[in-house]
Amino acid sequence: MDLKEISKQTEEVIEELLDIANLKPGSLFVLGGSTSEILGKKVGTAGSLDVAKAVVDPILEAIHKRGLYLAVQGCEHINRALLVEEEAKDKYGLEEVNVIPHEHAGGSIQTYAYQQFKNPVMVENLKGLGHAGLDIGLVLIGMHLRPVVVPVRLSRNKIGEATIVAARTRPKMVGGERARYKKL
């Protein structure tokens, strides 16, 4: 698999998703992914830090450009704990846990991202506070998003060989048939 192509596909996907999601600075963006799936293998069987770099670098660039916080989900071996910047942990009141991700407990994407963060901390969960997210390889990130999740259909549905699912969230609409709502 060509790493430049993976990076290009990731850049296209993240830019399109962030344009559609229209997040405010300081919002939490959730990333979950499997480099094994990107390579066409079963999740957890062919991790690659090189593939992780090709995915994480363009995502971090897009996230930083918009003033967002990135939360990177780990694998089931660390109970799907997430990597965030310490500033995001403090802002959102998240519970820190003690684990350092590596390729076989956390996964390649989280491991590479951990090395790139300025002040990385691991948190147990996001308390359902994520504003939008990207799932690369069907690793299931929905548990970290706010209650009203809106699927986002992108022009591309794969990165490498991995199926992707993108989502944004919106506030709950309350009040019934006589209520009026802001256009979202």
UniProtKB/Swiss-Prot annotation:
It holds the Pfam family DUF436. It comes from the Bacteria. Belongs to the UPF0340 family. This is UPF0340 protein TTE0860.
